[in-house]
Amino acid sequence: MRLYHGSNVIIDTINLAMCRPYKDFGKGFYLTDIKEQAEKMAVRVSTIYGGSPVVNVFEIEDDFKKIDDIKVKDFGLETTEEWATFVMNNRNRILTDVTNSLCNQDNKYDIVIGPVADDNMALLFRQYENEMIDFATLLKGMIYKKTSSQYSFHTEKSIKLLRKVEYYYG
């Protein structure tokens, strides 16, 4: 399977220490199986941080989810209540129960797969956290959002499953 990472730099070696915390699935290296999504992210990142848009292409074995010592959390393609709680917990900077199964701030999952929480969803999350809307309203707002796909890698053993194939400027 091919996975794509949109950036403003060519990535030869993945360094988890360079990854930012409090992302949808926790601190990790994020990719997508949707080429166009990575290309858009590359443009966005290069616009914000400078440089040229570049898409780094990696491969992973199709059956990686079956590897015994790799813990994978797969939400599928749909936004669900479980997914929403997981994303909110990972984005929460004051969460105290990081061992909760619906959180990955402690990297209990090596790989997490699921929809992307876009900027509109981030607004919904903030409204919910500030008690401006209830959970039912949050879920209703998310159900109709167009989602896309992300694969996040959180541990060195999961990073070792990725093989760099190529890069191209986009």
Regions found by a protein language model. Give the residues of each.
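Short aromatic-glycine-(Arg/Gly/Cys) micro-motifs in beta-strand/loop hairpins
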Residues: 1-23
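Short, conserved beta-strand segments within well-ordered enzyme catalytic domains
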Residues: 3-5, 30-31, 57-59
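Short, flexible loop/turn elements at secondary-structure junctions
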Residues: 8, 35, 62-64
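Extended catalytic/binding region for NAD+/ADP-ribose chemistry, centered on the ART fold
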Residues: 20-45
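Conserved NAD+-utilizing ADP-ribose enzyme module
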Residues: 23-24, 44-54, 60-170
